[in-house]
């Protein structure tokens, strides 16, 4: 793949969406609201634990993982939500993984994909997602707002992902309640945890904020803990010798 990761991925998503049909709505899976949970549990840094077999930057990470066992370990050790990669081409995920995991855990599940169309949102909801991801860099603001409103009208929560100040301002403008700061540049796929620290100076009171990517150790987590409600962690958990211990290590006590 070229260095321009995001445009390449979005081109592929356009092809995939053209082949999707709009599914009939199935009942929304019942669990707690992530926003409410993060607002009311601020004594520690909450973990969004990810099931991810591969990525464009890392290549194969853990192809042989038992996805349900991994998800259950996350849940048993206090994860606030499980993020499930559903992108097939670039992350070796699958919508079926979301279906499997969602039937086996009680906590919220995030459909982690590059969503550009309502059909993807309905498919994710029907597969058991209670939260979807919308990436500011992937969509014009008006379209982002349309998809955000569509998702919330279906009872879903939305993690709105940003990477820089203009994108954070967009997330604030559309009224996002759950905002992610991705420490990974989606054009180059390079990471810098300082992205989270720099943007945290522009946070508002109402939303909750999640730091994403480039968090591997308790020391990394401690850097962002004073400013964020939670962190999204994939690679560090998928490669850990002791997954339970790694989840606990990242749950920084905020007092």
From Swiss-Prot:
Domain of life: Bacteria
SUPFAM superfamilies tied to this protein: Ribulose-phoshate binding barrel (SSF51366)
GO molecular function, one term: indole-3-glycerol-phosphate synthase activity
Uppermost EC category: lyase
EC number, as in UniProt: 4.1.1.48
Cystine connections: none
Entry's family note: Belongs to the TrpC family.
Matches recorded under CDD domains: IGPS
Origin species: Streptococcus thermophilus (strain ATCC BAA-250 / LMG 18311)
Catalysed reaction equations from the record: 1-(2-carboxyphenylamino)-1-deoxy-D-ribulose 5-phosphate + H(+) = (1S,2R)-1-C-(indol-3-yl)glycerol 3-phosphate + CO2 + H2O
UniProt keyword terms in alphabetical order: Amino-acid biosynthesis, Aromatic amino acid biosynthesis, Decarboxylase, Lyase, Tryptophan biosynthesis
Gene Ontology BP terms: L-tryptophan biosynthetic process
A Pfam family: IGPS
Gene that produces this protein: trpC
Listed InterPro entries: Aldolase_TIM, Indole-3-glycerol_P_synth, Indole-3-glycerol_P_synth_dom, Indole-3-GlycerolPSynthase_CS, RibuloseP-bd_barrel
Pathway: Amino-acid biosynthesis; L-tryptophan biosynthesis; L-tryptophan from chorismate: step 4/5
Protein name: Indole-3-glycerol phosphate synthase
Gene3D superfamilies: Aldolase class I
């Amino acid at each position: 793949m070229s260095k321009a990761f995001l445009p390449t991925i979005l081109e592929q998503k356009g092809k995939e969406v053209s082949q999707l049909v709009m599914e009939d709505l199935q009942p929304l899976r019942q669990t707690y609201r992530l926003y409410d949970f993060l607002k009311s549990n601020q004594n520690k840094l909450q973990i969004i634990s990810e099931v991810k077999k591969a990525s464009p930057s890392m290549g194969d990470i853990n192809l042989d993982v038992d996805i349900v066992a991994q998800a259950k370990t996350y849940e048993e050790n206090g994860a606030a939500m499980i993020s499930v990669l559903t992108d097939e081409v670039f992350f070796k995920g699958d919508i079926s993984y979301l279906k499997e995991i969602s039937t086996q855990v009680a906590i919220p599940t995030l459909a982690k994909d590059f969503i550009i169309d309502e059909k993807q949102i309905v498919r994710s909801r029907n597969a058991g997602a209670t939260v979807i991801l919308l990436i500011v860099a992937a969509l014009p603001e008006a379209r982002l707002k349309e998809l955000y409103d569509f998702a919330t009208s279906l009872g879903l929560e939305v993690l709105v992902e940003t990477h820089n100040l203009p994108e954070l301002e967009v997330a604030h403008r559309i009224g996002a309640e759950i905002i992610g700061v991705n420490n990974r540049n989606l054009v180059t796929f390079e990471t810098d945890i300082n992205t989270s620290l720099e943007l945290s100076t522009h946070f508002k009171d109402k939303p909750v904020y999640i730091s994403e990517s480039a968090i591997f150790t308790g020391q990394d987590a401690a850097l962002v803990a004073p400013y964020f409600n939670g962190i999204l962690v994939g690679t560090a958990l998928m490669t850990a010798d002791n997954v339970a211990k790694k989840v606990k290590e990242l749950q920084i006590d905020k007092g």
